[in-house]
């Protein structure tokens, strides 16, 4: 495992690609890897999933504002390398409004840090999570890359491989126990 050193200062890079047709900005927040071995670890994963769903909805609302410099934005939580986990926020911005687009995304992150999410946002995220049930019901139609990702995580990180029935049971057992306070507390782990 090659370690990625921690740092207190912001690191940045400006890149261009003549073949790229759009302009984007990306922000990476790195942490030490979080284990996935216990029920508590899986519960934390659900909390983070809800946080991502709510953050995604905030970013969608940002793109709908009149004259928004952001065309599309998305948060992604995952593994960067084996020695670091990452929370990534990517935004596709108007060509001539890169700084304004980055500022808009950072402003939304600051707003979330300061005020957190609301009960209504969490209720909507939990409702959307129930739609996973439709996906779990179609396990025989799941793309193989889902299983490849599970095998990779198991081999590289020791994460368990969960089948659809187990994952559905865990979700249904845990979803009602997750509180807004817990979701808002996890923000401090990322931002």
Where are these regions (language model features)?
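Short, surface-exposed recognition loops and adjoining beta-strand edges that mediate ligand/DNA contacts
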Residues: 2-8
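Divalent metal-coordination and catalytic microenvironments
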Residues: 49, 105, 183
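Long, His/Glu/Asp-enriched segments that create or flank divalent metal/ion-associated functional microenvironments
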Residues: 44, 48-52
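Short, surface-exposed beta-strand/loop micro-motifs that present aromatic residues
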Residues: 9-17, 187
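M16 family metallopeptidases and their MPP-like homologs
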Residues: 16, 20-43, 59-175, 180
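Segments forming glycine/polar-rich beta-alpha architectures that bind adenosine-containing cofactors
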Residues: 178-182, 186-191
């Amino acid at each position: 495992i090659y370690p990625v050193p921690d740092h207190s200062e912001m690191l940045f890079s400006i890149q261009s690609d003549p073949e790229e047709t759009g302009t984007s900005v990306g922000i990476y927040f790195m942490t030490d890897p979080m284990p996935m071995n216990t029920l508590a670890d899986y519960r934390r994963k659900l909390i983070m999933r809800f946080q991502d769903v709510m953050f995604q909805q905030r970013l969608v609302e940002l793109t709908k504002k009149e004259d928004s410099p952001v065309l599309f934005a998305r948060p992604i939580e995952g593994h960067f390398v084996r020695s670091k986990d990452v929370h990534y926020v990517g935004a596709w911005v108007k060509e001539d409004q890169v700084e304004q687009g980055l500022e808009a995304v950072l402003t939304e992150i600051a707003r979330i840090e300061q005020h957190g999410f609301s009960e209504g946002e969490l209720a909507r995220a939990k409702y959307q999570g129930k739609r996973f049930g439709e996906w779990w019901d179609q396990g025989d139609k799941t793309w193989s890359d889902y299983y490849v990702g599970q095998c990779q995580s198991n081999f590289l990180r020791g994460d368990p491989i969960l089948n659809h029935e187990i994952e559905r049971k865990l979700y249904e057992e845990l979803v009602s126990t997750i509180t807004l306070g817990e979701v808002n507390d996890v923000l401090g782990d990322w931002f």
